[in-house]
C-alpha cells in the first residue's frame, strides 16, 4: 500500500516530483516503508531498535503522526533536536520521544533520498532491453574474473577506501544526485545538530562519523555510496580507459556495491589542484575490484610500479576530497605469500609444482613446471567470530541458545536457522574446501536445538529423543542439493569429490549477511 502511495506521488508530474522531494518528509507512509525495510533487511530477522532501548517502538503509528505534527509547527523540530541532544548529554531518562524523532527522521529521510537513485533503475519504454543482463550483476561473477586474471599477476594493493571526516563533504557530493534544495537544507540541519551534540560530548571528528554510521545506518550508507560513486567517477581511468559491470540494486536503492575493471592503458591524469598534468605510466595488466569499502588493485608490474600507485591514491583522495588518507589503509603484498579476505572468502594464489614426462627419440626426461592457481576457502575462524557477535555461539565456538527467538513457534525457529545454513552453503559454493563449513553447520544446528530446548524448558537430549534425531537433518544438506534458479531442482551431482567442486552462481546479488557482518564489524 505504501509503495502504491509513493508511486502515485511520483507519477503526478515525474519531472517536477523527482526534483522536489521535501513534501514527502511529512507523509506517514514514508516512515512505514522505513520501518518495513528495517524488519526485512537481514537474515538474522533482528528488528531495528531505538538506540538505548530494549524493544522495538518504530511500529507505533501514533508516535509517527505526532512527529509529523511537530514538524509542521514552526521551529518545533529544532527544539526537539536540541532536547534530544541535551537529554543524551546529561543521561536523561525521559528522552524517548526526542530519541525516536531523531532516528525516525533519519530513516524517513533516507527513504526519500533513495528515490532519485531508484528511478534510475526503472527503464523507459524507449530503451532497448538486453535479455539476461541480470546475470552480469551477480557477486559470484567476480570470482571467475579473479581466477582468470590474478593467477598471472605479481602484486596486489589491499585498499580500505577512506571516507571524509566532515559530513558536509558528503552533502556536497550528494548535490550531484539530488536537485531538491529544501531537502539538502534539511539534511544539513540534521547533520549540523548531530555535529553540535558531538562537540558537547567531546567526540573527535574522527570518531564522529563512526558514531553517525552506527546510529543512522541507512542514511550513512546513502551518503557513503554517493561518495564512492563520485570517487570512482573522478578516478579517470575507471571512467574513460576501462570497462566495468553496472552496479547492482539492493531493494529500491541503487547501491554501487561492486564492479571490476581491466585497465587497458593509462597515459595521463589531469589534476586541477596540481595545476599541471601528471604523466603516468602504461600498465596493461592492472585490475581493480571493489565491494563496498574494500578494494583490490592488482598488477603484473614491479614493486616500484605498485608503490607509485599507492602514492597516487593517497594524493588523489587528499586533493580531490580534502582529507588525508592514512597510508596504512593501503597494503602492498606479493601474491606468492599473501592471502586476502574479500567478499566472504580467503583468497590466495597457490603455486602447484608438477612434473611432465617427455620423450625425444629414445631418451626420456622429466620437466618440472610450476603453475599458479587462484584458490578460495571458507574463513572458518572469522565466521565463528561473526556467529559469536550474532549470539549463536561463544567466541570459542561453543553453541548457545538464541533467547530472542525462543518465543517463536518451533517451525519458525527451525526455518530461521535452516535459512542461514542454506544461505551459507549457497554463498560458499565456490570454496575449494567445503568440509570447513561442517563446523559452522554444527554450531547452528546445536544452537537451534538449544533454542528449542530453552523454549520447552527441557534439555537438548530429551528434545531430540522426543522429536527425533532427524529433526535438524536439513542443516547438513549438501550444497549440490541447494535449490538455485540457475540449476533445475532435479540436477544431481556426484557426491564423491563434491567437496572439491567449485560452483559460482549467477543469482547472488548481495553478500552473505554473516560475511557482510564481519566486513563492517
From Swiss-Prot:
Keyword Mitochondrion among UniProt keywords: no
GO biological process: mRNA processing; RNA splicing; tRNA processing
Pfam families: Intron_maturas2 (PF01348), MatK_N (PF01824)
GO CC annotations, alphabetized: chloroplast
UniProt xrefs under InterPro entries: Domain_X (IPR024937), Maturase_MatK (IPR002866), Maturase_MatK_N (IPR024942)
Name of the gene: matK
Main location: plastid
Family under the similarity heading: Belongs to the intron maturase 2 family. MatK subfamily.
Cited function: Usually encoded in the trnK tRNA gene intron. Probably assists in splicing its own and other chloroplast group II introns.
Xref: PANTHER family: MATURASE K
Region forming the signal peptide: none
Protein name per Swiss-Prot or TrEMBL: Maturase K
The UniProt record lists the keyword Chloroplast: yes
Assigned keywords, A-Z: Chloroplast, mRNA processing, Plastid, RNA-binding, tRNA processing
Subcellular location field: Plastid, Chloroplast
Bilayer-crossing regions: none
GO molecular function, one term: RNA binding
Amino acid at each position: 500500500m505504501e509503495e502504491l502511495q509513493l508511486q502515485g506521488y511520483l507519477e503526478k508530474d515525474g519531472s517536477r516530483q523527482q526534483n522536489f522531494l521535501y513534501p514527502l518528509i511529512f507523509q506517514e507512509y514514508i516512515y512505514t516503508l522505513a520501518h518495513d525495510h528495517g524488519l526485512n533487511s537481514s537474515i538474522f530477522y533482528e528488528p531495528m531498535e531505538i538506540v538505548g532501548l530494549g524493544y522495538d517502538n518504530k511500529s507505533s503509528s501514533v508516535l509517527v503522526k505526532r512527529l509529523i505534527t511537530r514538524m509542521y509547527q514552526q521551529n518545533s523540530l529544532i527544539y526537539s533536536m536540541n532536547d534530544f541532544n541535551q537529554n543524551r548529554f546529561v543521561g536523561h531518562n525521559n528522552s524517548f520521544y526526542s530519541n525516536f524523532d531523531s532516528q525516525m527522521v533519519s530513516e524517513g529521510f533516507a527513504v526519500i533520498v533513495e528515490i532519485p537513485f531508484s528511478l534510475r533503475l526503472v527503464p523507459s519504454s524507449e530503451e532497448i532491453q538486453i535479455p539476461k543482463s541480470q546475470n552480469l550483476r551477480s557477486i559470484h561473477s567476480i570470482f571467475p574474473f579473479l581466477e582468470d586474471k590474478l593467477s598471472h599477476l605479481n602484486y596486489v594493493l589491499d585498499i580500505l577506501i577512506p571516507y571524509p571526516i566532515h559530513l558536509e563533504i558528503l552533502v556536497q557530493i550528494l548535490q550531484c544526485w539530488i536537485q531538491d534544495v529544501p531537502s539538502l537544507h534539511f539534511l544539513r540541519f540534521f547533520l549540523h545538530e548531530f555535529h553540535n551534540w558531538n562537540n558537547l560530548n567531546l567526540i573527535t571528528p574522527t570518531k564522529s562519523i563512526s558514531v553517525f554510521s552506527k546510529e543512522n545506518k541507512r542514511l550513512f550508507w546513502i551518503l557513503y555510496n554517493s561518495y564512492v560513486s563520485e570517487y570512482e567517477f573522478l578516478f579517470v581511468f575507471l571512467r574513460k580507459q576501462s570497462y566495468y559491470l553496472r552496479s547492482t540494486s539492493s531493494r529500491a536503492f541503487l547501491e554501487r556495491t561492486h564492479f571490476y575493471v581491466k585497465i587497458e592503458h593509462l597515459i595521463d591524469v589531469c589534476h586541477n589542484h596540481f595545476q599541471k598534468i601528471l604523466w603516468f605510466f602504461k600498465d596493461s595488466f592492472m585490475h581493480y575490484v571493489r565491494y563496498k569499502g574494500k578494494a583490490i588493485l592488482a598488477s603484473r608490474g614491479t614493486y616500484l610500479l605498485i608503490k607509485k600507485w599507492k602514492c597516487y591514491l593517497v594524493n588523489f583522495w587528499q586533493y580531490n576530497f580534502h582529507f588525508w588518507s592514512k597510508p596504512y589503509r593501503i597494503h602492498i603484498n606479493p601474491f606468492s605469500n599473501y592471502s586476502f579476505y574479500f567478499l566472504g572468502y580467503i583468497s590466495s594464489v597457490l603455486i602447484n609444482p608438477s612434473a611432465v614426462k617427455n620423450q625425444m627419440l629414445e631418451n626420456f626426461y622429466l620437466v618440472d613446471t610450476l603453475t599458479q592457481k587462484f584458490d578460495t576457502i571458507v574463513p572458518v575462524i572469522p565466521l565463528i567470530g561473526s556467529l559469536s557477535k550474532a549470539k549463536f555461539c561463544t567466541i570459542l565456538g561453543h553453541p548457545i541458545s538464541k533467547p530472542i527467538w525462543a518465543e517463536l513457534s518451533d517451525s519458525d525457529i527451525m526455518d530461521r536457522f535452516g535459512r542461514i545454513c542454506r544461505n551459507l552453503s549457497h554463498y560458499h559454493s565456490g570454496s575449494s574446501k567445503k568440509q570447513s563449513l561442517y563446523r559452522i553447520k554444527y554450531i547452528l544446528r546445536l544452537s537451534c536445538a538449544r533454542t528449542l530446548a530453552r523454549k520447552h524448558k527441557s534439555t537438548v537430549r530429551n528434545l531430540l529423543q522426543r522429536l527425533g534425531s532427524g529433526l535438524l537433518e536439513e542443516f547438513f544438506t549438501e550444497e549440490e542439493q541447494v535449490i538455485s534458479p540457475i540449476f533445475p531442482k532435479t540436477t544431481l551431482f556426484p557426491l564423491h569429490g563434491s567437496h572439491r567442486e567449485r560452483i559460482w552462481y549467477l543469482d547472488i546479488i548481495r553478500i552473505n549477511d554473516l560475511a557482510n557482518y564481519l566486513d563492517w564489524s
